[in-house]
Amino acid sequence: MAKGAREKIKLVSTANTGHFYTTDKNKRNMPGKMEIKKFDPVVRQHVLYKEAKIK
């Protein structure tokens, strides 16, 4: 069976609150690290989230 193109990732807040989102991405279409602005409920603001590996 073939390996899937999608990989599970964790998006960690850059506000150092410890909050994170989990999602998946297509590693063929997006080979680099994902960065996206999302809402951090701890600081109640939109902040930058950076990709990290799920352990």
Swiss-Prot record:
GO terms for biological process: translation. It comes from the Bacteria. Pfam families: Ribosomal_L33. One of its GO terms (cellular component) is cytosolic large ribosomal subunit. Keywords: Ribonucleoprotein, Ribosomal protein. GO terms for molecular function: structural constituent of ribosome. PANTHER family: 54S RIBOSOMAL PROTEIN L39, MITOCHONDRIAL, LARGE RIBOSOMAL SUBUNIT PROTEIN BL33M. HAMAP family: Ribosomal_bL33. NCBIfam families: PRK00595.1, rpmG_bact. Belongs to the bacterial ribosomal protein bL33 family. This is Large ribosomal subunit protein bL33. It comes from Aliivibrio salmonicida (strain LFI1238).
